[in-house]
Each structure stands twice: as structure tokens, then as C-alpha cells.
């Protein structure tokens, strides 16, 4: 997993100035041998899970929200050949390489409420093509290819559209809420 591409993809789904301030960032959770990144604006969601911890120095059980504005500035100083380590120390100070990141003190939404398995079928569902294109671009950024394919799950006309992708050392879920037509 390329950390910089992953963060750039997550930023494509992260709002810039949502009144729900806790959404203006990326949630990072260390759970055992896995790190989970979540980003949502309330209509789209992107979740990336990785077991590739080479550039992640985060203690088990720790979670935090990285402020989008802080990450926007920092990420531009790194290149594909210069991958920094995302670190959270014992005092909960978060850094990307040697640069400090601002974190958001708040409760991130329970993303697993919308990422759930179901066998319910539906014939018609509304899709906002602009949001679909934006989410598609984020997925292509993670995989670093223009031809990204994945599994599509539609549970119901009023439920989310789920895209699942799984690779050797990481996986991600992209989610799009249905549009009212």
C-alpha cells in the first residue's frame, strides 16, 4: 500500500468545511495487525484497511482524526519516492514524517452502521453521477491505476451502494448513498 496515494484518495472524499467539524478529517484506527482509515462526507464513504505497517507507527487500540487542512499542506511536501511514516506517539502527537499534524477532538461517525452485509435485492436505485465519478477517482488513486475494478453490492433503493476491493496487503470499501429521484 502506498501511504501517500491512500491519504490523497481519502482526502478526495473528506469535506473541507462541513458544519459537522469531525467530518473534516480522516479517522485512523489501529486494531491489532491492521490499520483502518475512514473518510466520509455523509453521502460518500471510503474505508481503507491495511496490514502493511511499514510506514505506520501507531500503537494498538489508538484512534484519532487527522484534520484535513493540516494534511493538505503536509502531503504536498512528499513524493512517491519519499514516503514518510505516519506516527502517533505516547502523548497522542501525530506526525507525518517530521511534520506535526493537527488532530480533531470529536467522535467520528460509526461507519459500520452503513457498511453492513445484507441479501436484500432492489430493482431501481438513484445514483448521483458526480459523486460516483468523484468516488471512482478516489479508488483509482488508491490502486494507482485508471482501470480499477471491484465488487458492487446494492442492498436496497434507500440503502448504500457498496464497492469492495481486496488485494494482498490492503483492502478498501467505497460507499455511495442513493440519490432521491
What does each model-identified segment do?
Residues 1-181:
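DNA polymerase processivity clamps
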Amino acid at each position: 500500500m502506498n501511504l501517500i496515494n491512500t491519504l490523497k484518495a481519502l482526502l478526495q472524499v473528506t469535506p473541507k468545511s462541513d458544519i459537522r467539524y469531525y467530518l473534516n478529517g480522516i479517522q485512523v484506527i489501529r486494531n491489532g495487525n491492521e490499520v483502518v482509515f475512514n473518510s466520509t462526507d455523509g453521502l460518500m464513504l471510503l474505508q481503507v484497511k491495511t496490514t502493511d505497517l511499514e510506514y505506520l507507527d501507531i500503537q494498538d487500540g489508538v484512534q484519532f482524526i487527522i484534520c484535513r487542512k493540516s494534511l493538505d499542506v503536509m502531503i504536498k511536501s512528499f513524493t512517491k519516492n519519499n514516503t514518510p511514516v505516519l506516527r502517533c506517539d505516547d502523548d497522542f502527537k501525530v506526525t507525518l514524517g517530521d511534520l506535526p499534524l493537527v488532530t480533531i477532538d470529536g467522535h467520528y461517525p460509526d461507519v459500520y452502521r452503513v457498511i453492513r452485509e445484507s441479501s436484500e435485492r432492489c430493482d431501481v436505485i438513484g445514483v448521483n453521477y458526480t459523486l460516483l465519478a468523484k468516488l471512482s477517482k478516489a479508488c483509482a488513486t488508491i490502486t494507482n491505476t485508471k482501470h480499477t475494478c471491484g465488487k458492487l453490492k446494492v442492498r436496497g433503493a434507500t440503502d448504500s451502494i457498496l464497492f469492495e476491493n481486496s488485494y494482498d496487503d490492503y483492502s478498501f470499501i467505497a460507499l455511495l448513498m442513493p440519490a432521491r429521484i
